[in-house]
Swiss-Prot record:
Compositionally biased region (Basic and acidic residues): 58-75, 144-155, 167-188, 347-387, 411-449, 460-483, 490-518, 537-547, 660-677, 688-758, 877-891
Described function: Involved in pre-mRNA splicing. Remains associated with spliced mRNA after splicing which probably involves interactions with the exon junction complex (EJC). Can trigger mRNA decay which seems to be independent of nonsense-mediated decay involving premature stop codons (PTC) recognition. May be involved in nuclear mRNA decay. Involved in regulation of signal-induced alternative splicing. During splicing of PTPRC/CD45 is proposed to sequester phosphorylated SFPQ from PTPRC/CD45 pre-mRNA in resting T-cells.
Residues in cross-link Glycyl lysine isopeptide (Lys-Gly) (interchain with G-Cter in SUMO2): 202, 215, 221, 252, 333, 346, 353, 375, 384, 386, 393, 398, 418, 424, 448, 452, 459, 465, 468, 476, 481, 524, 548, 555, 599, 694, 702, 706, 708, 753, 756, 872, 875
Region (Disordered), start-end ranges: 1-94, 117-558, 660-951
Record region (Required for mRNA splicing activation): 2-190
Stated name of the protein: Thyroid hormone receptor-associated protein 3
Bias-annotated ranges (Acidic residues): 926-936
Main location: nucleus
UniProt record similarity statement: Belongs to the BCLAF1/THRAP3 family.
Length: 951
């Protein structure tokens, strides 16, 4: 039903928005009301729409203290309160200027314009559903009455719009206020139309069941249809337990149930949007117990609303004057819906019977019918509803009519008469109680409905109640005793449903007297209807209530009990009915007392019983689980001795172990020195020995311990280079020995390079090494590494390079290179190589030409892990490419690269930058290659001489 309501209230919401706005404005019963609604809503919506539609928001609805009202984000640092209107960019000093001044529309730049929804200024009070709050402060401030009526109207429309429980509650509140007003208004026009119809209007407005009374007298014949339909729709809406009265308007409630929201005040703002849907949804929800109750309550509202709204649509026959028609169209609807609604009712009853088709429900339906007879005409629709969900309408209707129809009609006629008098009293008391009722608006929802219907119904019904309740009592008691055992678990659920239903119907019934009665009646009807267990509970509560009704302790009983109580209390509730709020307040108290006393009785009895039943219910699965758990614990205790170690100790042990291992690794690791001491001299000192010695040790160890520790550490690269350079040195040496590879590299770099590399590869290698070393030495003490490397033959150099020590020297010389090109490239060469590969190959040809022999030999190594040298480059692509290609690219790119080289590459930068050759080669390119080859050879020779001296 909520979906139906939502769809309906979707259409209705637009309609209701326009209707409740326009209706509030144009149609509204009281223009002040509608204007306040429309003003409050206009402000809300206009602020919303304005904020959304670029209207100047600077002073839009200053809802919040200006402290928080950052004037639409004029500038947070300027202080919210400053009259500095946010100057967006592109605007001069025009606070909310025209388009060019940046003040277009919202006068704020777009990026800040639309944060108003979130701005403290709006304080989120303008939520997507702006100020739909039931006591909307604005509406309240405008006028209390206007709040109740027009604000209720706006809220009702908003509730139609949102069709949320909250809105429904609000809508019921509005309806209750509207029903009060419209019952006063409508009952006045109705009384003008005829006292009976005025009462009908009142009762339809107030108790929807008035239409039942009206129909009892006016449409006794349609009423059976209406009762049939009412039973069907009541069963569908299961909330309209008043349905003969309430349901007569709601007979079309399938369609109208959603519409009911605007039930009394609004003739047909949302004429029955989708009867089957609303019935189906109502039926489904009523089937679902609490949901059913809620839907029933909403149907009650909607049925009234539909009765009033959709009578024009569904049953244009205007039995009741259209003025009262909003609430009284329910009579028309009853008539037309008696026939049309009977089909719905039958269909829905059959559906419900299929869904909830339980003979038990039929039994309860009979009992409920009897009880509902006693309860009042509305009760028989309620009974029908109760029985109908489970029994076909005809089945439930037949016993219903047979047992209840005469009495029901009698009750209806009496009820009409009494309701006419009662409504007159109510109108008087309504004015009296309005002050009271406003004070107690929280009780508006239920008490009014219950009081109104119950007052009349209790007058008629109390006479018959004692006997009927007793009979119902006995029948229900039997049923209940039979079902009591089953009801135990359900009673709790039913109570919950009842509570939820009562809450919903309290809120939802506000403008819905039948709902009040329904709540009392439909409470159980819905619960019975929603599930056979809830009906059991309903029967239980009705038995209890029956006894209570006999005691006329209406508080602790359903509306029947209330009606029993009505003589004592319902008269006050008649007054309360007359004045919506006071009536609602007192009646809500009564409802609370009744609901809670019933609930309490049920709860206390059924809670304890339910606890037992719950335990028994729990036993199969819960006890089994408990049993398994017990077994597990037992087995663990007896068969698996605990180590006596706590989890903390256990995990601490692991942590300690890990820490010890880490400490040992750190102690062992010379990488710490490398990490800490990155100076080339340190590398030189540690380099050959440590790196060479460590290269086997460090690779795994370092790789695991240190590399893990410092992922950016060059040690990873160094390690891999060491490993790969050692391998590569072997390969590289063979390659080194082969200048052709160097030449191939140089070919890659340049054919000139290759030629030059071949020509003076060894000499140039030495010179380049010397140069590289001298550069690196000039750049840093790494030249000593270079010198060492130079001291060694190229192969030795390559070995050194391949060795971690040489790698270190290379690191020193070509900082990035050392780490990068530990693969056994000559340091100087590798400097250039690292540069040279990227550079040497293409950019750094100069050094490559000079280095080409060394670089090529090294590059043979380089190749090996060069990207060029696929095996290594692929294998260690990350490190090798980063090292070799990365370093070379990095060097070649101008130190751009070298995540790894950077650690040592920094030195390289210094060294390489210090080395004129490096800088020159870096930019020399192929041209520079030749120059570098010549000048580089000279420089390298010089540097080689310098390096030996330095070393």
């Amino acid at each position: 039903m909520s979906k139906t309501n939502k769809s309906k209230s979707g259409s209705r919401s637009s309609r209701s928005r326009s209707a409740s706005r326009s209706r509030s404005r144009s149609f509204s019963k009281s223009r002040s009301r509608s204007r306040s609604v429309s003003r409050s809503r206009k402000r809300r919506l206009s602020s919303r729409s304005r904020s959304r539609s670029y209207s100047p928001a600077h002073n839009r609805e200053r809802n919040h203290p200006r402290v928080y009202q950052n004037r639409d984000f004029r500038g947070h640092n300027r202080g919210y309160r400053r009259p500095y209107y946010f100057r967006g960019r592109n605007r001069g000093f025009y606070p909310w200027g025209q388009y060019n001044r940046g003040g277009y529309g919202n006068y704020r730049s777009n990026w800040q314009n639309y944060r108003q929804a979130y701005s403290p200024r709006r304080g989120r009070s303008r939520s997507r559903s702006p100020k739909r709050r039931s006591p909307s402060p604005r509406s309240r401030s405008h006028s209390r009455n206007s709040d109740k009526s027009s604000s209720d109207r706006s809220r009702r429309s908003s509730s139609s719009r949102s069709s949320s429980n909250h809105s429904r509650v609000e809508s019921s509140k509005r309806k209750s206020t509207k029903e009060k007003k419209s019952s006063s208004k409508d009952s006045r026009p109705s009384q003008a139309a005829g006292d009976n119809q005025g009462d009908e209007a009142k009762e339809q407005t107030f108790s929807g069941g008035t239409s039942q009374d009206i129909k009892g007298s006016e449409s006794s014949k349609p009423w059976p249809d209406a009762t049939t339909y009412g039973a069907g729709s009541a069963s569908r809406a299961s909330v309209s337990d008043l349905s003969p009265r309430e349901r007569s308007p709601a007979l079309k409630s399938p369609l109208q149930s959603v519409v009911v929201r605007r039930r009394s005040p609004r003739p047909s703002p949302v004429p029955k949007p989708s009867p089957p849907l609303s019935n189906a949804s109502q039926m489904g929800s009523s089937m679902s117990g609490g949901a059913g109750y809620q839907s029933g309550a909403h149907q009650g509202q909607f049925d009234h609303g539909s009765g009033s709204l959709s009578p024009s649509k569904k049953s244009p026959v205007g039995k009741s004057p259209p003025a009262t028609g909003s609430a009284y169209g329910s009579s028309q609807k009853e008539e037309s819906a008696a026939s049309g609604g009977a089909a719905y009712s039958k269909r829905y009853l059959e559906e419900q019977k299929t869904e909830n088709g339980k003979d038990k429900e039929q039994k309860q339906t009979n009992a409920d019918k009897e009880k509902l007879k006693e309860k009042g005409g509305f009760s028989d629709a309620d009974v029908k509803m109760k029985s109908d969900p489970f029994a076909p309408k005809t089945d439930s209707e037949k016993p219903f009519r047979g047992s209840q129809s005469p009495k029901r009609y009698k009750l209806r006629d009496d009820f009409e008469k009494k309701m006419a008098d009662f409504h007159k009293e109510e109108l008087d008391e309504h004015d009296k109680d309005k002050s009271k009722g406003r004070k107690e608006p929280e009780f508006d929802d239920e008490p009014k409905f219950m009081s109104k219907v119950i007052a009349g119904a209790s007058k008629n019904q109390e006479e018959e109640k004692s006997g009927k309740w007793e009979s119902l009592h006995t029948g229900k008691e039997k049923q209940r005793k039979a079902e009591e055992m089953e009801d135990e678990p359900f009673t709790e659920r039913s109570r919950k449903e009842e509570r939820g239903g009562s809450k919903r119907s309290e809120s939802g019934h506000r403008g819905f007297v039948p709902e009040k009665n329904f709540r009392v009646t439909a409470y159980k009807a819905v619960q019975e209807k929603s599930s056979s267990p809830p009906p059991r509970k309903t029967s239980e509560s009705r038995d209890k209530l029956g006894s209570k009704g006999d005691f006329s302790s209406g508080k602790s009983s359903f509306s029947i009990t209330r009606e029993a109580q009505v003589n004592v209390r319902m008269d006050s509730f008649d007054e309360d009915l007359a004045r919506p709020s006071g009536l609602l307040a007192q009646e809500r108290k009564l409802c609370r007392d009744l609901v809670h006393s019933n609930k309490k009785e049920q709860e206390f009895r059924s809670i304890f019983q339910h606890i037992q039943s719950a335990q028994s219910q729990r036993s199969p699965s819960e006890l089994f689980a408990q049993h398994i758990v017990t077994i597990v614990h037992h087995v663990k205790e007896h068969h698996f001795g605990s180590s006596g170690m706590t989890l903390h100790e256990r995990f601490t042990k692991y942590l300690k172990r890990g820490n010890e291992q880490e400490a040992a690794k750190n102690k062992k690791s010379p990488e710490i020195h490398r990490r800490i001491d990155i100076s080339p001299s340190t590398f030189r000192k540690h380099g050959l020995t440590h790196e060479e010695l460590k290269s086997p040790r460090e690779p795994g160890y370092k790789a695991e311990g240190k590399y893990k520790d410092d992922p950016v550490d060059l040690r990873l690269d160094i390690e891999r280079r060491k490993k790969h350079k050692e391998r590569d040195l072997k390969r590289g040496k063979s390659r080194e020995s082969v200048d052709s590879r160097d030449s191939s590299h140089s070919r890659e770099r340049s054919t000139e390079k290759t030629e030059k590399t071949h020509k003076g590869s060894k000499k140039q290698k030495k010179h380049r090494r010397a140069r590289d070393r001298s550069r690196s030495s000039s750049s840093s003490s790494q030249s000593s590494h270079s010198y060492k490397a130079e001291e060694y033959p190229e192969e030795a150099e390559e070995r050194e390079e391949s060795t971690s020590g040489f790698d270190k020297s290379r690191l020193g010389t070509k900082d990035f290179v050392g780490p990068n090109e530990r693969g056994g490239r000559a340091r100087g060469t590798f400097q250039f190589r690292a540069r040279g590969r990227g550079w040497g190959r293409g950019n750094y040809s100069g050094n490559n030409n000079n280095n080409s022999n060394n670089d090529f030999q090294k590059r043979s190594r380089e190749e090996e892990w060069d990207p060029e040298y696929t095996p290594k480059s692929k294998k260690y692509y990350l490190h090798d490419d980063r090292e070799g290609e990365g370093s070379d690219k990095w060097m070649g790119r101008g130190r751009g690269r070298g995540a790894f080289p950077r650690g040592r590459g920094r030195f390289m930068f210094r060294k390489s930058s210090t080395s004129p050759k490096w800088a020159h080669d870096k930019f020399s390119g192929e041209e520079g290659e030749i120059e570098d080859d010549e000048s580089g050879t000279e420089n390298r020779e010089e540097k080689d001489s310098l390096q030996p001296s330095a070393e």
